[in-house]
């Protein structure tokens, strides 16, 4: 008999003996079988009833954020409708969340859905994001679901050589289609940013060129901001 099977069998026998003693008001048989360990009844019942679940921790904890601003809130204070949805730190908790949230093709028009490292807010003003920038990919309407998933898996799975440079990712749902952006924290680090852009394209098998815009440029120039790096 295998050691693991033996352990289960002896534990089960011991628990059964305890239950029999409790039911009859009697004492546990003093003559224990070889290798048998008798625990207190509560402990034995707990052992039998416990579901053993092994979880696999991620390199970092991550938080999903949702934003569906109205035109008014955009004008008054960008991010005022941003809300924290769920924080996860294991593979299993990620899938539990992902399988119970709307994917980009099912989100309402104008929505932004973010996944950022825990305690980093998806805002230019966040101190970790403030000196960074974004890589951005465009997709036809309803065609970004798989790429969004692959982006999340590569990001939370620490598949990027410069993964510590990554703050998070966001998918924007708009009338003309969806955009997925990777936010990084040090835009001036060209080596790291170009590496991230190239690997991201490889992970998603994305054939079009993608550009990187500094947050500072985006804040100053808005839609007129130009790509600093292109891959």
Swiss-Prot record:
Segments of skewed composition (Basic and acidic residues): 1-20
InterPro entries, per database record: TIF_eIF4e-like, TIF_eIF_4E
Entry-linked SUPFAM superfamilies: eIF4e-like
Disulfide bonds: 129-167
Localization per Swiss-Prot or TrEMBL: Nucleus; Cytoplasm
Annotated stretches, region: EIF4G-binding: 56-59, 66-102, 150-159
Top-rank lineage group of the source organism: Eukaryota
GO BP, sorted A to Z: defense response to virus; regulation of translation; translational initiation
Pfam families according to UniProt: IF4E (PF01652)
GO cellular component, one term: cytoplasm
Entry keywords, A to Z: Cytoplasm, Disulfide bond, Host-virus interaction, Initiation factor, Nucleus, Plant defense, Protein biosynthesis, RNA-binding, Translation regulation
PTM: According to the redox status, the Cys-129-Cys-167 disulfide bridge may have a role in regulating protein function by affecting its ability to bind capped mRNA.
GO MF, one annotated term: RNA 7-methylguanosine cap binding
Chief location: nucleus
Signal sequence, renumbered to the chain: none
UniProt: mRNA binding residues: 74-79, 106, 124-125, 174-179, 219-223
Region (Disordered): 1-34
Quaternary assembly: EIF4F is a multi-subunit complex, the composition of which varies with external and internal environmental conditions. It is composed of at least EIF4A, EIF4E and EIF4G. EIF4E is also known to interact with other partners. In higher plants two isoforms of EIF4F have been identified, named isoform EIF4F and isoform EIF(iso)4F. Isoform EIF4F has subunits p220 and p26, whereas isoform EIF(iso)4F has subunits p82 and p28.
Protein family according to the UniProt entry: Belongs to the eukaryotic initiation factor 4E family.
Function, as annotated: Component of the protein complex eIF4F, which is involved in the recognition of the mRNA cap, ATP-dependent unwinding of 5'-terminal secondary structure and recruitment of mRNA to the ribosome. Recognizes and binds the 7-methylguanosine-containing mRNA cap during an early step in the initiation of protein synthesis and facilitates ribosome binding by inducing the unwinding of the mRNAs secondary structures. Key component of recessive resistance to potyviruses.
UniProt-listed PANTHER family: EUKARYOTIC TRANSLATION INITIATION FACTOR 4E RELATED, EUKARYOTIC TRANSLATION INITIATION FACTOR 4E-1
Protein known as: Eukaryotic translation initiation factor 4E allele Eva1
Species of provenance: Solanum etuberosum (Wild potato)
Lineage: Eukaryota, Viridiplantae, Streptophyta, Embryophyta, Tracheophyta
Name of the gene: eIF4E-eva1
């Amino acid at each position: 008999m295998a050691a693991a099977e033996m352990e289960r069998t002896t534990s089960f026998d011991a628990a059964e003996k305890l239950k029999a003693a409790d039911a009859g008001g009697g004492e546990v048989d003093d003559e224990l079988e070889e290798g048998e360990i008798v625990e207190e009844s509560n402990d034995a019942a707990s052992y039998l009833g416990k579901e053993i679940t092994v979880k696999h921790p991620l390199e970092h904890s991550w938080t999903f954020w949702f934003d569906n601003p109205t035109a008014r809130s955009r004008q008054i204070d960008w991010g005022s409708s941003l809300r924290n949805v769920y924080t996860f730190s294991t593979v299993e908790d990620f899938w539990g969340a992902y399988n119970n949230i709307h994917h980009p093709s099912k989100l309402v028009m104008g929505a932004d859905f973010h996944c950022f490292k825990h305690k980093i807010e998806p805002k230019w003003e966040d101190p970790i994001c403030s000196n960074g920038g974004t890589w951005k990919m465009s997709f036809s309407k309803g065609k970004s679901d798989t790429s969004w998933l692959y982006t999340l898996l590569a990001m939370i799975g620490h598949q990027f050589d410069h993964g510590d440079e990554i703050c998070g990712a966001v998918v924007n749902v708009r009338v003309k289609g969806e955009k997925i952006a990777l936010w990084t924290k040090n835009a001036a680090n060209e080596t790291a940013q170009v590496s991230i852009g190239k690997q991201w394209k490889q992970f998603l098998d994305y054939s079009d060129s993608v550009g990187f815009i500094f947050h500072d440029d985006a804040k100053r120039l808005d839609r007129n901001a130009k790509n600093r790096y292109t891959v």
